Amino acid sequence: MQDTPPAAALDAQAPWLAPLRPLLPLLAQADWPAALSREAARRDVRTAAGLPVRFVPPQDAGATAYEAHIAATGRVPTRAGGAGALHDAGNALMWLTLPRSKAALNARQAAELARAGVAATRGAVRDAAT
């Protein structure tokens, strides 16, 4: 059974979605992560280190911490279906809408991971950046 694209879970007319409305049709595509990757390429969305941002399957990160993986590769693990798809779609929309903010937050997270390592909980710095 194929998962429903995240657009089906959204009320596109909700006022809080107004800034994102131009991007919502991309979430209706069967391979919406690829559609958002193409849009990221078109907009030249980059990490703080200048790497192009792309939305990839979660297994792409392997055992690497999520934010560290993004900072090192520009590849954002994105669940295309299931319970996490809507959350990851929202994250991708933020990368497309607020790319410099997302890049700065990701860089801060990655720096904290490099400093403190991965622990059972995020810690104050990473919680604030999340």
Locate each region found by the language model.
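The feature captures two recurrent sequence modes
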Residues: M1-R75
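Aromatic- and glycine-enriched beta-alpha-beta binding-site module
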Residues: A65-T130
